[in-house]
UniProtKB/Swiss-Prot annotation:
Lineage per the UniProt record: Bacteria, Pseudomonadati, Pseudomonadota, Gammaproteobacteria, Pseudomonadales
GO biological process, one term: mRNA pseudouridine synthesis
Active site annotation, chain numbering: 48 (nucleophile)
EC number: 5.4.99.25
HAMAP family attached to this UniProt entry: TruB_bact (MF_01080)
Keyword Nuclease in record: no
Leading EC class: isomerase
Catalytic activity line of the entry: uridine(55) in tRNA = pseudouridine(55) in tRNA
InterPro entries tied to this protein: PsdUridine_synth_cat_dom_sf (IPR020103), PsdUridine_synth_N (IPR002501), PUA-like_sf (IPR015947), PUA_sf (IPR036974), tRNA_psdUridine_synth_TruB (IPR014780), tRNA_sdUridine_synth_fam1_C (IPR015240), TruB_C (IPR032819)
Transmembrane segments annotated in the record for this chain: none
GO MF terms held by the record: RNA binding; tRNA pseudouridine(55) synthase activity
Gene: truB
Biological role stated in the UniProt entry: Responsible for synthesis of pseudouridine from uracil-55 in the psi GC loop of transfer RNAs.
Protein name: tRNA pseudouridine synthase B
Organism: Pseudomonas entomophila (strain L48)
Gene3D superfamilies with a match to the protein in the record: Pseudouridine synthase (3.30.2350.10), PUA domain (2.30.130.10)
Length: 305
């Protein structure tokens, strides 16, 4: 008997998931996609299985703008375990070295200012970065270590929240591409005792905060009670991640031409940069870029939601 193909729903929007411990970002995405029965889905940058917290999941038309969330600043709280280093710089790796911990709160407070601002980081071997088409973590699992070029990242916030024994909790605000495992490992070396990430929780992704998230258990409960459609109430608008962008409103006439690929003028447009665009009904219709002549050129358009 032939298997009946599941017809997926054409839904658009963003679900802010509090990613559970032990899930890869893709596993979490596919689970929510199944619950929602969504036709198209994507996430906005990976969180390690060890990590929990804010993971924006994009569906339908919202996937067109996931790159802009990927490029946004992030916030984390992490527990730094001092006295040991591991192969993965987190609790899941093999212990490589154990050292005595003779430092306390005052020592950590004295060290962390040097890691604020623009710093250079060498990406860890256990990362998704690729060398000759191969993810570094696959090379690492095969016992290979390759040279990695240091990359510039920005640490806008680095604060010590608490310190007890050999563990310290840190709050971090950083630019895209920052590896918290590398940051913690580097702080550990600066302290002279080594360190790794024992816990990691993302508290912010762009404009989204932890308080806005929904748990997988809540989504499963809603699905059990009302099916796929019951999850629609958790969907945020497709432009939710762009709320910090300048907003331009187009007249019905201008919106028609803009949606057909033509650059148009708008009285409330800024002098330059990227903008999110709404039509005369206040409906989000895409993003544009203000050109030198003041016209708004369409960059990504959205179908009617």
């Amino acid at each position: 008997m032939a298997q009946v193909k599941r017809i997926r729903r054409n839904v658009s929007g963003i679900i802010l998931l509090d990613k559970p411990l032990g899930f890869t970002s893709n596993a979490a995405l596919q689970k929510v996609r199944w619950l929602l029965n969504a036709e198209k889905a994507g996430h906005t940058g990976s969180l390690d299985p060890l990590a929990t917290g804010v993971l924006p999941l994009c569906f339908g038309e919202a996937t067109k703008f996931s790159q802009y969330l990927l490029d946004s600043d992030k916030g984390y709280e992490t527990v730094m375990q001092m006295g040991q280093t591991t192969s993965t710089a987190d609790a899941e790796g093999e212990v490589l070295q154990t050292r005595e911990v003779t430092v306390g709160r005052a020592d950590i407070e004295a060290v962390i200012p040097r890691f604020r601002g623009d710093i250079l980081q060498v990406p860890p071997m256990y990362s998704a970065l690729k060398r000759d088409g191969q993810p570094l973590y696959k090379l690492a699992r095969a016992g290979e270590v390759v040279e990695r070029e240091a990359r510039s990242v920005t640490i806008g916030r680095l604060e010590l929240l608490e310190c007890e024994g050999t563990r310290a909790r840190l709050s971090v605000g950083c630019s895209k591409g920052t590896y918290i495992r590398t940051l913690v490992e580097d702080i550990g070396e600066a302290l002279g005792c080594g360190a790794y990430v024992a816990e990691l929780r993302r508290t912010q992704a762009g404009p989204f905060a932890l308080a806005q998230t929904v748990t997988l258990e809540e989504l499963e409960q809603a699905h059990a009670e009302g099916g796929n459609e019951a999850l629609d109430r958790f969907l945020m608008p497709s432009d939710s991640g762009l709320q910090d962008w300048p907003l331009v409103l187009l007249s019905e006439h201008s919106a028609f031409y803009w949606l057909h690929g033509q650059a148009v003028r708008a009285p409330d447009a800024p002098q330059f940069g990227m903008v999110r665009v709404q039509d005369h009904n206040g409906r989000f219709i895409g993003i544009g870029e203000v050109s030198e002549d003041g016209r708004i050129a369409p960059r990504r358009l959205i179908r009617s939601e």
